[in-house]
Regions:
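Short active-site oxyanion
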Residues: 2-3, 58-61, 80-82
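C-terminal binding/interaction regions
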Residues: 2-6, 10, 89-145
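Glycine-rich phosphate/diphosphate-binding loop of Rossmann-like nucleotide-binding domains
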Residues: 4-24
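Short amphipathic alpha-helical segments
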Residues: 17-19, 73-77, 117-118
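A short beta-strand-loop structural module common to alpha/beta enzyme folds
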Residues: 27-38
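Short, structured active-site "lid" loops
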Residues: 42-64
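Mid-chain, well-packed structural core segment of small domains
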Residues: 63-64, 69-109
Length: 145
């Protein structure tokens, strides 16, 4: 899977996201503080990663900032992107299952190495629900303007 990763800070957990995704066999394209010459600010770096998903150049994105909130807000401004700020495995599983999330937002402050691995395990194990009400909710997101 091709995954766009952004961070507004070159923090150890941001590097761990990249390393862990690569260890799992994914191709990583980095943005923001993780890519020399990129604008590092959370709004710009998260937008760049999210656009990769929206334009079909990446399958998913992981967007990071200190709290994860700004990165998730910026990513969700990109049409077609459904970013979920996840601080635990249960939220990551639910975001994939019920919301068909295609961008994972993470807090650089709160996410430890072991927690990151749990979140990624749940994220990649999760699959979008086939339930009619879940599909209807996700479809309705495209209608909201």
């Amino acid at each position: 899977m091709r995954i766009a990763v952004s961070s507004d800070m070159d923090e150890p957990v941001a590097r761990l996201v990249v390393d862990e995704l690569r260890r799992r066999g994914h191709t990583v394209v980095a943005y923001g503080a993780l890519r020399a010459g990129d604008r590092e600010d959370w709004a710009w770096s998260a937008e760049n990663a999210a656009r990769q998903v929206a334009e079909g150049r990446a399958d998913q994105a992981v967007v990071c900032c200190w709290t994860g909130t700004g990165a998730s807000i910026a990513a969700n401004k990109v049409p077609g992107v459904r970013a979920a700020l996840c601080a635990d495995a249960y939220s990551a599983d639910g975001a994939r299952k019920w919301n068909d999330a295609n961008a994972l937002a993470l807090s650089l402050r709160l996410t430890s190495g072991p927690l990151l691995r749990e979140i990624l395990d749940a994220w990649f194990a999760g699959a979008p629900s086939d339930e009619d009400d879940d599909r209807a909710n996700v479809a309705h997101l495209e209608e909201i303007r």
